[in-house]
Amino acid sequence: MEMLYHSVSDLVRLANEHQIPLWKVVLLADVQERQVTVEESFETMRQMYQAMRQADQEYDGSIVSASGMAGGDGEKLHAYNASGRSLAGGYMGLVMEKAVKMGESNACMKRIVAAPTAGACGVIPAVFLSYEEYCKETENRMVEALFVSA
């Protein structure tokens, strides 16, 4: 079955036609495009997700960029969130914290997780990792969601 799509409406149409979830349409398109197995495609995406998690876990608030303009703010946001005074609340506070940490790691030339772009390097990792942590979601479900975001 051919899984060519050019828009979200194409994705929805294919998912409905084949009675499969959206993420599987994207996975099958990847399988066709790269000529790999379903398992290889899923494992590649899992490795990308794990790289995002590793970048988050390896954040070091003491490292400052060469310009001195980036570094340490992720740690400040962490302390602010931990204080319980955050106006943004649990999930949104966590997303902002992780996004800043990813951006700082990028600026300090640590692991660069450019998703969706280098200019917004922390957005997808921050949202996904925070959701996984805050909502106690499984890694497999997060990898499936990553296919949809692709």
What are these regions (language model features)?
Residues M1-K110:
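Generic N-terminal targeting/processing segments that precede catalytic cores or assembly contacts
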Residues L87, P116-C121, E133, E144:
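Glycine- and small hydrophobic-enriched segments that form the cores of compact globular domains
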Residues V143, F147-A150:
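A structural-propensity feature for long, helix-poor, extended segments
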